A protein has these predicted regions:
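Membrane-interface interhelical loops and short amphipathic "cap" helices
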Residues: 25-59, 110-138, 163-164, 188-211, ...
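Single conserved hydrophobic/aromatic residue that forms the stacking wall/gate
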Residues: 1-16, 20, 265-266
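Hydrophobic or amphipathic alpha-helical targeting/insertion segments
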Residues: 18-50, 61-108
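Membrane-entry segments of alpha-helical transmembrane domains in multi-pass membrane proteins
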Residues: 3-4, 14-17, 47-68, 86-93, ...
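Polar, glycine-rich mid-to-C-terminal structural blocks
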Residues: 216-264
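Conserved, charged catalytic cores of large soluble enzymes
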Residues: 3, 114-116, 146-169, 191-198
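Helical transmembrane-bundle signal
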Residues: 17-18, 22-26, 66, 70-73, ...
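Membrane-interfacial loop-to-helix junctions in multi-pass inner-membrane proteins
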Residues: 4, 14-17, 75-99, 159-180, ...
C-alpha cells in the first residue's frame, strides 16, 4: 500500500514549488519589472540560459535550494518500511528547515524585489556562465547538498526515538542518492573548469571546489559506515555524527560561496 503524504507536507511542497515556478516564468517571459530578472537576464538569450538564470545568482539559488528541499521532503513522505511516528518526526524536522530557509529568503535574499525604474531590457547573465554544463551544474550540486537534509533529519529523529534498525536502510538509500548527485555536480563543474580558459584544468584546488569536496568526502564515509553497520551502537553514533556533518558542511559551503566571501568566477 502506497502511503499518502501528510497534508502539511503536500502544502509546503506545493507552495515552495509554485513560488519557484513563478520566478522561472518571470525569467522566461523577460519580466524586467522583477529586479532579479533585470540583473541576470536578457530578452535575446536562449531559453536554456533564461531558465538557468534563475539560479545563477544568490537570491535565485536560495529559492532553488528551498524548492529542492520541498521536493525531497515530498518524496520522503512516501517512504515505506519505516515507523509512522519516526517518519512524522523526520518530516517535522524537515518542515522546521523549510521555515528557517524561507525566513532567510524573505528577509535577506528576496528574489521578487520590484525594479524601481522602467526598463525595456535586462543586463544579462555573465557570458562565462552561459555554458550548457554550468546550466545544469547548480541544480545537480544542490540536489546533493539538500539530499543530506533528509539524512540529517533522520539522524536527529533517531536521537529522540528508540526504533529498530529499519531507519538505517532508509538513511543509506538517501545518502547514496545525495552522494551520487553531489558527485555528478562536482564532475560537471570540473568539466567546465577543464575547457574554461584560465580556470586551471580539471581540479585546481580552488576554494569553491574544495567547499563542495568537503561534504563529498564526509558523504563517502557515511555511505561506507551505513554499509558496515550490524547493530553496533558505536557505529550508529558515528553514523549520526556523519549525517549531521554532511548537512552542516553543505549548508556552510553554500552560504560561504553565496555570501561573496569566496568571490570567484563561479555560480
Amino acid at each position: 500500500m502506497i502511503r499518502r503524504p501528510p497534508r502539511s507536507t503536500h502544502c509546503i511542497s506545493s507552495a515552495a514549488s509554485d513560488v519557484y515556478k513563478r520566478q522561472m516564468y518571470a525569467y522566461v517571459v523577460s519580466d524586467f519589472s522583477n529586479y532579479n530578472v533585470f540583473q541576470n537576464s536578457h530578452s535575446n538569450k536562449p531559453l536554456i540560459y533564461k531558465i538557468s538564470g534563475t539560479w545563477g545568482n544568490h537570491e535565485g539559488s536560495m529559492l532553488l535550494w528551498l524548492s529542492i528541499l520541498s521536493i525531497f521532503s515530498f518524496f520522503f513522505s512516501f517512504t515505506k518500511n519505516i515507523e509512522d511516528n519516526f517518519q512524522k518526526l523526520t518530516l517535522i524536522i524537515q518542515a522546521f528547515l523549510h521555515i528557517l530557509f524561507g525566513l532567510f529568503i524573505v528577509f535577506t535574499s528576496n528574489p521578487f524585489l520590484v525594479n524601481s525604474i522602467l526598463v525595456n531590457e535586462g543586463l544579462g547573465l555573465n557570458p562565462i556562465l552561459q555554458d550548457p554544463g554550468l546550466a545544469v551544474h547548480p541544480p545537480i550540486l544542490y540536489a546533493g547538498y539538500v539530499g543530506y537534509s533528509i539524512v540529517f533529519s533522520i539522524a536527529i529523529a533517531g536521537l529522540f526515538q528508540n526504533t529498530d534498525d529499519e531507519w538505517l536502510y532508509v538513511a543509506k538509500k538517501w545518502s547514496l542518492i545525495s552522494w551520487t548527485f553531489l558527485t555528478g555536480g562536482i564532475a560537471l563543474g570540473s568539466y567546465w573548469a577543464y575547457y574554461e580558459l584560465g580556470w586551471g584544468g580539471w581540479w585546481f584546488w580552488d576554494p569553491v571546489e574544495n567547499i563542495s569536496l568537503m561534504p563529498w568526502i564526509a558523504g563517502l564515509a557515511l555511505v561506507h559506515s551505513l554499509m558496515m553497520v550490524r547493530g553496533e551502537q558505536a557505529i550508529k553514533k558515528w553514523i549520526v555524527f556523519l549525517s549531521i556533518l554532511c548537512f552542516s558542511l553543505s549548508v556552510f559551503g553554500t552560504f560561504l560561496v553565496r555570501s561573496g566571501i569566496l568571490s570567484l568566477i563561479h555560480i
